[in-house]
Amino acid sequence: EPYLKNRQIMRFKDAIYDLNNNVSQPGIYAIPSELSMNSPLVPMENPDPVYGPYIRWDLYKELGYPQIDALEDLLPVLKQMQELEPAADNGEKTYAFSFFKDWDSNLMNAVKQPCCFYGYDEYGFVLVKADSSDYQSIIDPDSLYVRVLKWYFDANQMGLVDPESSTQTFESFETKYKEGQLLFCTWPWVAQPAYNTQERTKEGKGFMMADIGDMVIYSYGCSPVGNQKVVMSIGSKAEDPERLAAFVDWLYSPEGIRNNRAQTSGGMAGPEGLCWEYGEDGPYLTDFGKKALLGEDVEVPEEWGKGTWSEGISALNYSTVASCELDEKGYPYAYLLWDSVRNMNISPLEIDWREKMGAETTMEYLQKNNKILVSPGTGYMAPQENSEMAAIRRQCRKVIQEYSWNIVFAADEAEFNRLYEQMCKEVKELGYETMLDIDLWNAKKKEDARWEAV
């Protein structure tokens, strides 16, 4: 704590103390991430949500923008898109869907993502609606999780699922978007940076969000107390804790915020004077910034240290503040939210999407059409589970993961049903209902904390 006294990071002192009040010994042991001065009801994401139905818009346009009323209606559209472009530029077969196991936790991660199209996110073995109006056990036959399992099963029966999904890594998954082998993505922050190169978007090609008639996308609200699960700390055996504290303070300064997140596509704007400047109408990108921030690995001028842009940018995957935060002059730190950038060299892809959707950005469309549901930000931390409960959870999640993958790739509907019933039977024998009760209790406590923050 003495190392942070009178430093600028203490403008976030309420959030810092909120986190450290949970520690038995007084003092400051950690700084939360993704801090925000905004209301908990303000979406943290902009100009795109974390989740959404992102498709190859050029192929969707070629089909005449068919109406998609519900999740299930998307499959025949994706099949027609696959028929329009059966092979990628590298000669490999195209698929709508591809998965990987790296991020599986209490469930199959790829199945959880489309649940977010309907305002739900996971909490243990529970799907929680952003407005706290519904709580679902993931294995309930009427749950969204089971609905998406069936959706992916149907997609696989139609030849829309990449058969390499169960053995590949995230890196392989991402590469397939770069190569044009995939036609759908639940994450704009994967598909768009990978596929939407300037060359392709000039041709009208790229991933953009399509509308599903009944979707209401889950959005993470800004948290005044930040993300208390991902924190910044100084080790007890650090040789120079005062110097490290100065570095942490810099990371949370306006300069540090911009420079640290400049490596992320659509992130912060990088160094002032090199990547951007303030003009009469607000911030704008320099010629160097346009190239570097939009994916070109340019040479850095000698006065800035020489070398290439990719060699010098931060490799720290850590967000000190929310993407929607404003700087000291009232402009967003995230350059994609600047008026000068939003209207800069708009590609034929973006022009067509804007004309069809009647909005300049995805978030603007979702907000105008009441298709987003914000979960208020909070720093609620669940009590730590004892060893017995942790063991039951490990066993249940292992069963749910393995069966979920097998269900998606089941040979036919009879096998789908058999595997689903067997999954439910096995986890219940392991103690699933006990864990479900714990998760429901914690989920409701977290929701109470969210609305208290509002």
What are these regions (language model features)?
Residues 1-12, 121-143, 217-220, 275-302, ...:
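Short, solvent-exposed loop/beta-turn-alpha elements that line the ligand-binding surface or hinge
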Residues 1-20, 78-82, 92-129, 181-200:
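Carboxylate/His-rich catalytic cores and anion/metal-binding grooves
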